[in-house]
């Protein structure tokens, strides 16, 4: 059976990450989302195609489907549709309006509408990585506990501590004396420096988080610079799930830990503090000592 990623016009909601790139170009685990979708379809036994018939599977390109759901769709073979709770067809075989069988998404399958959906996909993908690969240089005074993929030309300096599943791209300088943990991916040409902690985050290419900073449960775009002492808060005092503005509405993210979403070319002044769930649009900046309580639009 063939599978076709069907082009859609996704509703706004994944900004500011998608202000400067298409949704399928967003880097998760240092791979474009569209490539991860294609790999998942192939692994489920589908042949990729750009055209298909009523016997083939069509998947929205802004939908993320679990391996289990893809297996179910492949076994059904005949007319069927996968609809979410809002009635949106995420995938279908034949005419979705006349499908004989309707499936319901599991917890790992959903329409990608908001930045926190991208974090959820990133966590799923990182959890499947079992083997590390070292193509750069690791100081004997660095510690790696977990799975590390380190790209060519990258260096882990003394005092670096890595745990969990971490991907670091090519030509990065990591350290000295920093802590990287959780499901974290760091793009090519990044600098993570002295006394910095990165936890469960996506850091895109050419970004610098040089010193005395914390970045947790966040998505940071490319060519971003953290001024010294920049802190992304990610936990509510009452322990409830975070809410974040999207499309003019305050939405529950479903996440107890949720940091900051930054677009490309953002610069923070020294000692900037960011409330959880706040978003900074591309090319915005903060002054030294700023407290970011609301989204910053360009």
Where are these regions (language model features)?
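Residue-level recognition of short loop/turn positions
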Residues: 9-11, 60, 86, 153, ...
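Acidic, glycine-rich loop-and-beta core segments that form the ion-binding/anion-interacting portion
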Residues: 150-203, 207, 214, 218
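Terminal amphipathic alpha-helical/low-complexity segments used for targeting or macromolecular assembly
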Residues: 1-137, 283, 289
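Short, surface-exposed helix/turn micro-motifs that flank interaction/cofactor sites
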Residues: 35, 155, 173-175, 225, ...
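Glycine-rich hexapeptide-repeat left-handed beta-helix
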Residues: 194-195, 200-298
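Conserved short-loop catalytic and cofactor-binding motifs
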Residues: 22-25, 106, 142, 160, ...
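A charged, amphipathic alpha-helical module
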Residues: 124-147, 152-158, 164
């Amino acid at each position: 059976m063939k599978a076709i990623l069907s082009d859609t016009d996704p509703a706004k909601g994944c900004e500011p990450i998608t202000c400067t790139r298409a949704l399928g170009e967003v880097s998760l685990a240092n791979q474009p989302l569209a490539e991860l979708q294609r790999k998942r379809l192939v692994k489920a036994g589908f042949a990729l195609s750009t055209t298909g018939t009523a016997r083939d599977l069509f998947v929205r390109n802004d939908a993320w489907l679990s391996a289990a759901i893809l297996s179910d769709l492949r076994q059904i073979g005949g007319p069927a549709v996968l609809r979410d709770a809002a009635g949106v067809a995420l995938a279908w075989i034949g005419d979705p309006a006349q499908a004989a069988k309707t499936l319901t998404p599991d917890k790992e399958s959903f329409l990608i509408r908001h930045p926190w959906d991208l974090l959820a996909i990133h966590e799923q993908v990182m959890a499947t990585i079992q083997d590390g690969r070292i193509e750069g240089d690791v100081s004997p005074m660095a510690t790696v506990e977990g799975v590390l993929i380190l790209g060519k030309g990258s260096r882990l300096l003394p005092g670096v501590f890595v745990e969990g599943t971490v991907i670091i791209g090519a030509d990065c300088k990591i350290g000295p004396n920093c802590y990287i943990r959780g499901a974290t991916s760091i793009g090519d040409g990044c600098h993570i420096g002295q006394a910095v902690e990165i936890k469960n985050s996506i850091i895109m290419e050419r970004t610098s988080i040089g010193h005395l900073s914390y970045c947790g449960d966040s998505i940071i775009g490319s060519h971003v610079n953290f001024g010294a002492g920049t802190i992304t808060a990610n936990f509510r005092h009452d322990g409830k799930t975070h809410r974040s503005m999207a499309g003019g509405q305050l939405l529950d993210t479903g996440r107890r830990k949720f940091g900051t979403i930054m677009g490309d070319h953002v610069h923070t002044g020294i000692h900037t503090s960011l409330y959880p769930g706040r978003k900074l649009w591309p090319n915005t900046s903060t002054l030294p000592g700023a407290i970011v309580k609301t989204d910053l639009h360009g």
